[in-house]
Amino acid sequence: IKQLDGAIGYLNYGYVVNSNDFQQVSLQNKAGNYVTANAETSAAGLSQIVLDDQLRGADANHAGANAYPIVSLTWVLAYPESKTGVKETLRYMLSEKAQAMSDGLGYVPLPEDLRQKALAAVETLQ
């Protein structure tokens, strides 16, 4: 994208928010509003993803007035009988402290309901 003058592309939130090399455009969401990606608009999009009991979900382009239309979750695969430290690492990643650092690292803090669902899944690990 950077090498071709006038190129349009899609980048992970972290590449845009932590770089002066790329310009961001506003995208029209289903509600008809033009929004740019930031922690607030991305979280608004994430908060509308409906997850089943296996934490699977789709269609992140919901009609929230302030929702950024292109959002996705980052998934972690952990086996029920995981190695020592996996459960503790995932607990930390989902902690309020770690979530508070997310935006500065180029990630969007999880909405509280998604964070709680993920924590419940972590607790099933042995």
Feature-to-residue mapping (PLM):
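Exported/periplasmic ABC-transporter solute-binding proteins
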Residues: 1-126
